[in-house]
Amino acid sequence: MEIEPVVRISFNGNNNQNNNNNNNNNTNNNSNNNNNNNNSSNINSTNKPSVKKPINQKMISNINNQKSPNPLNSSVDDNNNTNNNNNSNSNGTDEDIIKLARDLTNTFGILLGDSDQPSQFSDVIFKVGDRKFFASKIMLVARSEYFKAMFTGSMKESSIKEITLEGVDPDVFFTVLKYICIGILDLDYDHRMVSSIYQYCDLLGLQRGKELSLATMGKIAQMYLEKPDVESALFLWDSLNQSAIPVESVHPHLRAFVLQYASISLHCDAFYSISLTTLVQMLRNDGLRMEELDILDCVIDWCRENSQASIQQQQQQQQQQLQSANGASGKSHGKRSSSSHLKKHDGDGGSDGSCSSRCSSRRNSLSLKDHHRQHIGNGGGGGGHYNNNDCHSDTEETYSDIDDEEHRNGGGGVGDDFENDSEDGDDDDEDDDEDDDFTDDDDKDDSANDDYEYSTNKDDLDIIEDWDTTIDKNLLDEVLPLIRWENMNIGEAFERLDNLKIIPDKEISNLLRHILKSNRGESFSFLGYHYRRPRNNRKRPYPIEFLLGITQPFDSNVTNEIIPLNSFSSEFGQSTNQFLYRIKKDIKLPANLERFSFKDREFFVQLKEREKGQLAVYLAFGSKLTKPLAISVLASVIGFRFQDSIEFSFKKMFDEGFDSAWGWPKFISLDTLYKQDKYSHYSDSFCLLIELTSQWG
């Protein structure tokens, strides 16, 4: 709440100026007169009291207690301004302060207008889009440094009546203008609207408005996590990136939440509308729980959806570059390659025109093939890339010097030269030293694409005509190197890449050989990028049925639920099935959970409380075994963020006639399970995952 603009204003009516030395009874009489004239909107009303007592923390606390928690604003609640102790002069003054704040809100409302006709006291008109807003300069100057500089400096806006503002939504401007004039910031649960209000408050220097907006976005994020609503959480993350708001400042677990539910977030409709920045952050993170081939399919689909917009943006940038080049250097300099795109230059990159021979731009036009080749002799160009700062090392050391030397010697890249890349012993020694200091953290951006160099091999400039022409190759060059290719099965990777037709057949063959090299700890190259060390494996993915299961609300007719998950492996005669229990925290122990079938046998889970408040979990048979059975069992209590999960496993050969239960007598502390949110889903339940694998029988 913005208190200062409210409590620093003192109303001095004509009847009060000559009565400053009256006793307390006169003060109380003036307060009564003020109550009778509470609806007046005149600032100079003769019935307003003079606030003589200095403002203390108790007064501010009482005002803070009046605000309504929803919507989040800094207004005074009219229904909570009654004081039970009317005989105390201090309490009477507190009431006056509360009424003063309310009157201030009502009074300065006349300075705010949103109609075709200006209000009586407005002296400036803002035109935002197709709407006009009327306001008072004195209020704007008093509350915002931005408007203070606009109206008190030498800017042309200080002398004109109507000001046109661009780059702001009319609804956002009206919300912030209302907050400036009457101290009310109306925030709903639309994260796009709230993030825009945050940005505009930041522009105007309204610190308290930023705090209120940030707090609201934190509540929105918490609501998405508790539902849970993966698609909306992904929307929020992308909105924060577009608004340049740090994700962790809104909610510390928002990023990890989206990554843990990757099987949902990468297949939802919201995924295809996220920005390139958000996609790159997702692919860089080791906490992305999804199989690499599935990630590849989702990335290709995203590139198809966003290629048209990307191509249009590149064409606009190229036109602007050509226009500026024509104006500065003449017609000859204006005929640059149409396959060149906007680039960020490294501090140590020596580019003298050879940037048009980059792998990321050389494949757009068959007619420009010769133009690309004529620049090869100039050396490898250094350009900016989303992958430029990826590094596992905690030090500031980079490979720029090594890259320069390699470029001068002809560079090492894909094709026939990839064998030379792995023979650089000095580089490998440096990488080994840095690997010792590496620590993994799912909550932070992390990538093993530590460094790369652009290939200058002429054989790499061949253009494949049967590529998928619907995809922007520049987008592919940005995101494909972030895929963890070495995590793939070679046969599946070849089949998938061959069907997609997104890279040349020669590069597919080289890629498969490089996958084998990376598995041996050697250098890894792909699409002209040279990776200094193999990347880390991602975390274990969960089946999509599991993720969908724990994101659905409980059936109100049952206490607990069991969700059978599809079999996800079957080899060498083994079969594996998972069964997900969702258990209410208030379940009465001991309890027998719902039954399920596996290998034509009936099983169920028993929960018991053991000594010292320990939860015991047992696997029980529905009937006696008619023949021996060998199985392995994995039981897991799935934490809200997955990495907090608790797992226990055993392998057991059950003899014929067995009809008892087998399990873990001390699984998890009940106090930990019930009281800590990290194991809670929907705040009133926890998840138990049972995984059974048959050995034989």
UniProtKB/Swiss-Prot annotation:
Q: Which InterPro entries match?
A: BACK, BTB/POZ_dom, MATH/TRAF_dom, SKP1/BTB/POZ_sf
What if the gene is knocked out? Mutant shows pleiotropic effects that include an inability of the spore mass to go all the way to the top. The upper cup, a tissue that derives from prestalk cells and anterior-like cells (ALCs), does not develop properly; it is unable to lift the spore mass to the top of the fruiting body, likely due to defective intercellular adhesion. The differentiated state becomes unstable; prespore cells transdifferentiate into prestalk and vice versa. Cells that find themselves in the wrong environment sort out to the zone that is appropriate to their new identity.
- Pfam families of this UniProt entry? BACK (PF07707), BTB (PF00651)
- Gene3D superfamilies linked to this entry: Potassium Channel Kv1.1, Chain A
Ranges of Basic residues compositional bias?
Answer: 332-344
Q: CDD domains from the xrefs? A: BTB_POZ_trishanku-like, MATH
* Compositionally biased region (Polar residues): 58-72
Q: Where is the composition biased (Acidic residues)?
A: 416-453
Q: In which tissues is it expressed?
A: Expressed strongly in presumptive spore (prespore or psp) cells during the late G2 phase of cell cycle. Present at a low level in vegetative cells.
Give every BTB domain span: 122-189
Q: What upregulates this protein?
A: Up-regulated by starvation.
Q: Where is the composition biased (Low complexity)?
A: 12-47, 73-91, 312-331, 353-363
Q: Name one GO biological process term.
A: culmination involved in sorocarp development
Q: Where is this region: Disordered?
A: 1-94, 311-455
Task: State the function annotated in the UniProt record.
Answer: Required for normal morphogenesis and cell-type stability.
By what name is this protein known? Trishanku
